[in-house]
């Protein structure tokens, strides 16, 4: 079983891991191209302000320095902050390393303990690597790191989950709804929080198959059998 998560633009650099560090060949190709960009080209690619341009330019130029971060500690978006509210991944390191994969436009499919550096890049950006878009470049590279027919619990955004042919796996999409006066609604913020908490709950409860996932009951969410299908689990919270 694998749990896939999207990365986050927001990052925390308060838990550095000083160590020798080598980029994979796939990631090095991307960094080399980014280093070749002028500031004007980089700003156009990243679509950032002058302040953020300087910050990201500096990150790229210093990419070979030895200070890195564990992926789960570095990413600090809403899903990851919610994850950390439920459980500490280092206390469940074996499960986290075996089952959780964060999908990155720079690093590919990485485990929570993999050492990475801060960056700003997503699959929708117009960067070309060997004539390929970022999405096409990573599609085969990411997918081949998963076994065919294994269970994949999708807690990632459509940007990353669309890399996969879902029919080749025991795939489970997960959606979260709030129900008020009989009406179901989805909210991006609530869904992001719930994805992070579900990943942490699965880790802390040593979930090994998708049927166990139906027991998830954090923050008032409960499995709704009437809305769910074999490959699509829906969780509803009454408000």
Language-model regions, residue ranges each:
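Internal, well-folded beta-alpha domain core
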Residues: 85-230, 234, 238-239
């Amino acid at each position: 079983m694998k749990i896939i998560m999207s990365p986050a633009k927001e990052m925390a650099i308060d838990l550095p891991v000083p160590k020798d560090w080598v980029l994979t060949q796939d990631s090095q190709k991307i960094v080399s191209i980014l280093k070749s960009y002028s500031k004007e080209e980089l700003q156009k690619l990243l679509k950032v302000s002058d302040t953020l341009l300087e910050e990201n330019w500096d990150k790229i130029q210093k990419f070979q320095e030895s200070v890195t971060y564990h992926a789960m500690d570095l990413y600090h978006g809403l899903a990851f902050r919610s994850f950390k509210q439920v459980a500490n991944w280092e206390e469940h390191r074996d499960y986290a390393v075996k089952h959780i994969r964060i999908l990155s436009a720079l690093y590919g499919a990485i485990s929570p303990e993999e050492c990475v550096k801060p960056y700003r890049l997503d699959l929708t950006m117009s960067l070309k690597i060997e004539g390929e878009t970022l999405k096409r470049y990573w599609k085969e590279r990411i997918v081949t790191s998963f076994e065919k027919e294994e269970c994949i619990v999708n807690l990632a955004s459509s940007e990353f989950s669309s890399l996969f042919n879902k029919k080749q796996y025991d795939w489970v999409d997960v959606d979260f709804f709030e129900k008020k006066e009989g009406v179901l609604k989805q909210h991006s913020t609530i869904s992001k929080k719930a994805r992070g908490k579900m990943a942490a709950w699965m880790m802390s409860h040593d979930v090994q198959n998708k049927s166990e996932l139906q027991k998830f009951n954090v923050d008032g969410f409960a499995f709704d059998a009437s809305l769910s299908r074999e490959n699509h689990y829906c969780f509803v919270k009454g408000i």
